[in-house]
Amino acid sequence: MAYKVLVVDDSQFFQVRLKQIINEHPDLEVVGIAANGQEAIDLEESLRPDIISMDYEMPHLDGISAVRSILSKRPIPIVMFSSMTYEGATITLEALDAGAVDFIPKNFAEVSRDSVVLKKRLHEKLLLFAQKAKPSVAARSTTQPSGVRPSALGANLSSSRSPRPASSAPSAPKKRIKGLVKLVAIGASTGGPVAVSEIITRLPANFPVPVIVAQHMPENFTKAFSERLNRQSAVEVREAQDGDLLKSGVVYVAPGGNQLMVDKTGRSIRILDGDARLTYKPSVDVLFASAASAMGDKVLAIVLTGMGADGCDGAKLLKQKGATIWGQDKDSCVVYGMPAAVAKAGLTDEVLPLDQVWQRLVSDV
């Protein structure tokens, strides 16, 4: 039995191509197509799909309004299919705030030319998040995405971005770092925008060290992400630029499509063109490796939710220099991939639930 997918897009071209691409996977089946948000609401009620692919700019009712309406009735994973423009990025982040679980960049050229990369990305994400909607199907499917935590996904689907109390008190620190840390470096991928926001928006304006975030996002998205975080946070948040001086209480978001490195002096940031040999731009490994070289044991590295193992190689270098490494725990991750890789390699000093990460940053750094 395949997962049931509802495709929502006002373009007939994208409707046809997305249906073709999605149906190529044996564990996915498009059961309906909606041309606007209102049709999406109606079809969701009648077809009861397991997951929805949602455009954002449509007549009659836009994607964000549809996301809010649908999620007010039941928790279903919704993946946004988003324009690569700055405007598209801004709206996509609003959709994530509204409860969408993730996004896929909407690239006409990739869809037109039958891109293998797009197919892989689309299939992986739809399968990954549909697993929460109908775990009984996951048990019978021919291909199961690994690492997804239904509990974490369910929380993401049902929670708002408003502040909420921590579920438990912070655990006792295993390694004393108060006054020793001079840089916090955070790496994240799938599920990261919400997780990073949960941490950064809780930091006080006088946070004593600079923070660098490498979040897997395309160009334009990181600019919109940093601006949105800046509006929501007490600390200053900015998209990093080449030559930026590292200042306490400032959060620097690595720009999409590029690599961010800490300068060898440990005082500033270098932004380099994305290396075609590297899958991720920005890469958590590149950030961690440069931080290890420049600042050694003065770094606190945090690996958050995400697919794959980006950050593990960089964490090894950090560990060799005596740096402190925290990993997000399995239950609070949307995808337990990157933190799992670091934990399995024996590199984490502590494994923490997401709601304890910001508390420990405030109390321990």
From Swiss-Prot:
Phosphorylated by CheA. Phosphorylation of the N-terminal regulatory domain activates the methylesterase activity. PROSITE patterns: CHEB, RESPONSE_REGULATORY. It is found in: Cytoplasm. It comes from the Bacteria. Residues 4-121 form the Response regulatory domain. The modification 4-aspartylphosphate is found at residue 55. Keywords: Chemotaxis, Cytoplasm, Hydrolase, Phosphoprotein. SUPFAM superfamilies: CheY-like, Methylesterase CheB, C-terminal domain. Residues 138-173 are annotated as: Disordered. Pfam families: CheB_methylest, Response_reg. InterPro entries: CheB-like, CheB_C, CheY-like_superfamily, Sig_transdc_resp-reg_Me-estase, Sig_transdc_resp-reg_receiver. The active site is at residues 189, 216, 310. It catalyses: [protein]-L-glutamate 5-O-methyl ester + H2O = L-glutamyl-[protein] + methanol + H(+); L-glutaminyl-[protein] + H2O = L-glutamyl-[protein] + NH4(+). Residues 182-365 form the CheB-type methylesterase domain. GO terms for molecular function: phosphorelay response regulator activity; protein-glutamate methylesterase activity; protein-glutamine glutaminase activity. Residues 158-172 have a biased composition (Low complexity). Its EC number is 3.1.1.61, 3.5.1.44. Its main location: cytoplasm. SMART domains: REC. Belongs to the CheB family. Contains a C-terminal catalytic domain, and an N-terminal region which modulates catalytic activity. Involved in chemotaxis. Part of a chemotaxis signal transduction system that modulates chemotaxis in response to various stimuli. Catalyzes the demethylation of specific methylglutamate residues introduced into the chemoreceptors (methyl-accepting chemotaxis proteins or MCP) by CheR. Also mediates the irreversible deamidation of specific glutamine residues to glutamic acid. This is Protein-glutamate methylesterase/protein-glutamine glutaminase 1. It comes from Saccharophagus degradans (strain 2-40 / ATCC 43961 / DSM 17024). The lineage of its organism: Bacteria, Pseudomonadati, Pseudomonadota, Gammaproteobacteria, Cellvibrionales.
